[in-house]
Regions:
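Small/aliphatic-rich secondary-structure junction motif
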Residues: 1-47, 125, 133-136
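Acidic/glycine-enriched edge-of-secondary-structure segments
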Residues: 2-8, 61-80
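Glycine- and acidic-residue-enriched helix-capping/strand-helix junction motifs
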Residues: 46-56
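Structural beta-alpha unit
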Residues: 70-98
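Glycine-rich, aromatic-bearing surface loops/beta-hairpins
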Residues: 100, 125-142
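Glycine-rich, Arg-bearing micro-motifs that act as flexible, cationic patches
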Residues: 104-120
Length: 142
């Protein structure tokens, strides 16, 4: 069974991502690991406990949406640096554990990850894995 690593935060559970996962499932059975990097807000003070709890809530919302759609998924939270978070998972699981990585971001402008060039950095860090970059048209409401 094919397995994909999905990396998202604000866009997790968005229709664009669910549609892509459905298209992957049309090609054959697959399962997914959702990785939600913690987010450090720039507009207010925060504690590590607060951002971890927020990431856990976002992960649970994503898992609930995937399960509601009949999609087999597990999940975890990761480091605030999404490239490092992915590298940690790939190192732990082994690069052969995944058939690909799906990275979901906000559009240019509001996307901090695009500003940091995360898609290109992730491709350089993991050339052995195909990386699909999806851009949401808005923050997931689910």
């Amino acid at each position: 069974m094919r397995r994909y690593l999905i990396v998202a935060h604000k866009t997790l559970g968005g229709d664009h991502l669910i549609d892509h996962v459905r298209s992957l499932r049309e090609e054959g059975p697959c399962r997914f690991l959702l990785l939600v990097p913690v987010q450090h807000p720039a507009d207010h003070m925060w504690t590590e406990g607060e951002v971890t709890a927020a990431a856990r809530r976002k992960l649970q919302e994503g898992l609930d949406r995937f399960h509601d759609e009949g999609i087999i998924a597990d999940g975890e939270i990761g480091d605030a640096n999404p490239v490092y978070a992915v590298s940690t998972v790939v190192r732990r699981e082994g690069s052969g554990a995944f058939d690909g990585i799906v990275l979901s971001t906000l559009p240019p402008g509001p996307s901090r990850w695009l500003h940091l060039d995360v898609p290109s950095r992730m491709r350089r860090e993991h050339p052995e894995l195909p990386i699909t970059h999806l851009v949401a048209d808005r923050v997931a409401a689910h």
